[in-house]
Design a protein with these regions (language model features):
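Viral virion structural and adsorption modules
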Residues: 1-23, 283-288, 320-335, 365, ...
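N-terminal secretory targeting modules
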Residues: 4-7, 11-231, 236-237, 241, ...
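Conserved SGNH/GDSL esterase-like catalytic core that processes O-acyl groups on lipids
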Residues: 71, 116, 124, 132, ...
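A short, gly/pro- and small-residue-rich
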Residues: 170-178, 308-328
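General small-molecule cofactor/ligand-binding pocket signal
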Residues: 264-268, 337, 377-378
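Active-site segments of SGNH/GDSL-like serine hydrolases
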Residues: 297-302, 326-362
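Catalytic His-Asp segment of secreted/periplasmic serine-dependent ester chemistry enzymes
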Residues: 343-431
Length: 431
């Protein structure tokens, strides 16, 4: 409800808080015990001439009772006969270039699945194994460490695997936000466990950093937390400079997450794509992920034309795509909190739109706040915005971008400072 502003305007922030409280009452703010991890957005299809097994050690946010792995397929055809093994670990090797290749007590659980073709252009199918009767075990290498799983995924010869489009550099070592180490070997490492011997996460060619199948992991937790679904273009996917799918949204989630109050994310963002496509990615998977928080970018620079700026047709598409998001959530019976990042500037040297940049500023200031079904992340654009050129186009602040459009590491940190309070507020409401 709206509160009558009869008192001095100095009380406006207080009334704003009351109105926001009323808006989120009844939404999915009490959290969930089913979390789904998907670290990478856009995928590429990688042909395999020989049978190949992908091995990985992955950290989850909190203790779990059971789990299931989802294997993505971005190929235009089905991939039958994929074999999956999963187990648990109590540690990871001290050296970040190594991975374990066997679980605790050599206890593997094995599954075989057939992967249907992709759901559409740039939209992978995700096929889940049955629920694995595996519970997490305590870490022995670090005190109070998060739980670790191990997996193997075996693809048959002459099949196609789906891998992170931009690889997964910086997901191990001192800069890694969570443990993710992968290795691979051209053997049938699920069929014959002993055949897989590759413990090296790095190789000059086709090493674990650039040649990996990373599964989706859905796990049922003891602690209650929030499930975030991130949807947008490259900025939301989290790329720019050295960043590989770990941008402001992802950082906000993992920096706030604790084993006692976990936050997990499903990265459904797709770089180089627009709202018409990435809103469909959300529609493809939202019923399985069942997020309690959705971050959705209604505006994408990929729909903005150099010189003329955003067209009337593109504006209609982005509004219709936002409508698709709400239709999808309603059809799935979901009422997550939806957060809208504002549209960010682009340097003139990257895409010159001149005075037409006013359309973006008007979108942020006037149109987006009218969408009552979500909350605008206020200050998101300002966190990146520097000066304005003579033609009227805002520029990204010096030092916050390397290419004039994507935030670099410092740029994502600047955005993160604006995003985190929204997640923290919702995390505080977990029942």
């Amino acid at each position: 409800m709206d509160y009558a502003r009869r008192l001095p305007r100095m009380f406006d922030p207080f009334f704003d808080q009351l109105e926001d409280r009323d808006r989120i009452d009844g939404l999915m703010t009490t959290g969930t015990n089913v979390l789904t991890k998907n670290l990478f957005g856009r995928l590429r299809a990688e042909p395999l001439s020989t049978a190949t097994t992908f091995n990985g050690n992955m950290e989850l946010e909190t203790e779990f009772l059971s789990l299931r792995l989802g294997i993505p397929n971005i190929h235009t055809a089905a991939v039958p006969g994929v074999k999956v093994s999963v187990g648990v670990l109590s540690s990871v090797p001290a050296a970040d270039y190594q991975v374990w290749i066997n679980p605790e007590n050599n206890e593997w659980l094995d599954f075989t699945i057939d992967l249907p073709a992709r759901l559409g252009e740039e939209r992978p199918s995700i096929t889940y194994i049955d629920v694995a009767a595996l519970a997490s075990v305590a870490r022995t290498d670090v005190a109070n460490g998060r739980t670790i799983i191990i997996y193997r995924i075996e693809f048959p010869a002459n099949s196609v695997a789906s891998m992170p489009m931009n690889n997964q550099y910086y997901w191990r070592g001192s800069r890694a936000p969570r443990v993710l180490r992968t290795s691979n070997q051209a053997v049938q490492g699920v069929t014959n466990k002993a055949a897989f011997t590759s413990q090296a996460a790095y190789a000059a060619t086709k090493g674990g950093d650039d040649y990996a199948v990373v599964p989706v992991v859905q796990y049922q937790t003891l602690a209650r937390g929030h499930q975030v679904m991130i949807c947008g273009d490259s900025i939301q996917e989290g790329i720019g400079g050295d960043v590989r799918c770990y941008g402001a949204m992802e950082r906000s989630v993992y920096e706030l997450s604790t084993p006692e109050r976990p936050l997990e994310y499903f990265n459904a963002a797709l770089h180089a794509q627009g709202p018409d496509l990435y809103s469909r990615m959300l529609a493809d998977h939202v019923a399985t992920v069942r997020p309690t928080i959705v971050t959705y970018s209604p505006w994408s620079g990929n729909d903005v034309t150099a010189g003329s700026g955003i067209s009337a047709a593109a504006m209609r598409r982005l509004k219709a795509s936002l409508g698709r998001v709400f239709y999808t959530l309603q059809a799935a019976g979901l009422r997550p909190v939806v957060l809208f990042p504002e549209a960010t500037p682009v340097n003139t040297g990257y895409r010159n739109v001149g005075a037409n940049d006013q359309a973006r500023r008007d979108f942020n200031a006037n149109w987006l706040p009218k969408v009552s079904a979500g909350f605008v992340i206020k200050g998101y654009a300002a966190a990146l915005t520097g000066g304005r050129d003579a033609a009227g186009q805002d520029q990204i602040k010096d030092g916050l971008t390397g290419d004039g459009v994507h935030p670099n590491d410092a740029g994502h940190d600047a955005l993160k400072a604006v995003v985190k309070p929204y997640f923290q507020r919702l995390l505080d409401r977990v029942a």
